[in-house]
UniProtKB/Swiss-Prot annotation:
Name of this protein: Putative pre-16S rRNA nuclease
Broad class of the protein's primary localization: cytoplasm
Molecular function terms from GO: nuclease activity
Function in brief: Could be a nuclease involved in processing of the 5'-end of pre-16S rRNA.
Family: Belongs to the YqgF nuclease family.
Domain of life, per lineage: Bacteria
Length: 137
């Protein structure tokens, strides 16, 4: 069974999927978030229809003191919606620096700042998911 990585942002959500052996992660896509959990649930259902997913791996951006950020509170609300709609397990991973890592990778690949915006969130989801896969091998 595969894992779905989720980088939940205030305006965009990045998605990544594991391979069938759960060895590596692949960036899937970004989803523009307008505050509608219903649209996110519909999008995730499309992933579930296409892939056999048993767990959602969600980035949880704690601050440098290990405390919840404002985004964590939104993610907590998002998790309530996931639990109401799906049976998959949910695992939170501290992802305080995944977006920064994603930006660095895109910069090193000589991708211009304007195009980085289109790729950063799904790359952050890929990093979150890969960190999880590496941790639980």
């Amino acid at each position: 069974m595969r894992k779905l990585g989720i980088d939940f942002g205030l305006s965009r959500i990045g998605f990544a999927i594991s391979d069938e052996s759960n060895s590596f992660s692949l960036a899937l896509e970004n989803f523009d978030y307008d505050g509608s959990y219903e649209k996110i649930i519909q999008k995730i259902q499309l992933f579930l229809d296409e892939y056999k997913i048993d767990k959602f791996i969600i980035g949880y951006p704690l601050n440098s003191r290990g405390e919840k950020t404002k985004t964590c509170l939104l993610i907590d609300e998002f998790i309530i919606h996931l639990e109401k709609n799906f049976d998959q397990k949910i695992k939170l991973i501290n992802e305080s620096y995944s977006s920064r890592k994603a930006s660095e990778i895109l910069h090193q690949a000589n991708i211009k700042n304007k195009k980085q915006k289109d790729k950063k969130d799904m790359l952050a989801a890929k990093i979150i998911l890969q960190d999880y896969l590496d941790l639980y091998k």
